[in-house]
From Swiss-Prot:
The keyword Iron-sulfur does not apply. Keywords: Ribonucleoprotein, Ribosomal protein. HAMAP family: Ribosomal_bL28 (MF_00373). NCBIfam families: L28 (TIGR00009). Transmembrane segments: none annotated. This is Large ribosomal subunit protein bL28. GO terms for molecular function: structural constituent of ribosome. It comes from Marinobacter nauticus (strain ATCC 700491 / DSM 11845 / VT8) (Marinobacter aquaeolei). Pfam families: Ribosomal_L28. GO terms for cellular component: cytosolic large ribosomal subunit.
Length: 78
């Protein structure tokens, strides 16, 4: 399972750890992904999504039905 948010498409990015002595070592910044079950009232069932916390806020704002419609339009299976 890849570390990609199903709603926003956020994925890991790379950067550097920088010590006090300004030594740089490569690292990955991972998105804050959560496996979450959302109740879809129109379908009378739960839908499991792997979403970032930003994705959860988008679902709170737009509603789960609108977000699922966007996902299905992209061809993602939910």
């Amino acid at each position: 399972m890849s570390r990609v948010c199903q709603v926003t498409g956020k994925r890991p990015v790379t950067g550097n750890n920088v010590s006090h002595a300004m030594n740089h070592t490569r690292r990955r910044f991972l998105p804050n992904l959560q496996n979450h079950r959302f109740w879809v009232e129109s379908e009378k069932r739960f839908v499991k999504l792997r979403v970032s916390t930003k994705g959860m806020r988008i679902i709170d704002k737009k509603g789960i039905d609108a977000v699922l419609a966007d996902l299905r339009a992209r061809g993602e299976k939910v």
